[in-house]
């Protein structure tokens, strides 16, 4: 069973300008429609990208648009 489907940053980059990428994401989101899977966009860099991704049905996102990466602090 698939719980999460993460979209590669190359698919997300400038998606608001790329119709082929929009069709691919729409298809992937549609394929997950009757499942428990949540679609997550990785590498979201702008509000325009995020707006389009939400319009296409993407559930969540991560990337510089939301927060800058932080270093991983491991216990000693």
PLM features: what roles do these ranges have?
Residues 1-76:
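EAL-family c-di-GMP phosphodiesterase catalytic domain
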């Amino acid at each position: 069973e698939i719980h999460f489907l993460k979209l590669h940053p190359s698919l997300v980059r400038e998606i608001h300008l790329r119709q082929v990428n929009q069709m691919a994401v729409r298809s992937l989101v549609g394929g997950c429609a009757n499942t428990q899977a949540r679609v997550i966009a990785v590498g979201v860099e702008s509000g325009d990208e995020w707006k389009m991704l939400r319009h296409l049905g993407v559930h969540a996102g991560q990337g510089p648009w939301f927060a800058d990466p932080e270093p991983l602090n491991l216990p000693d």
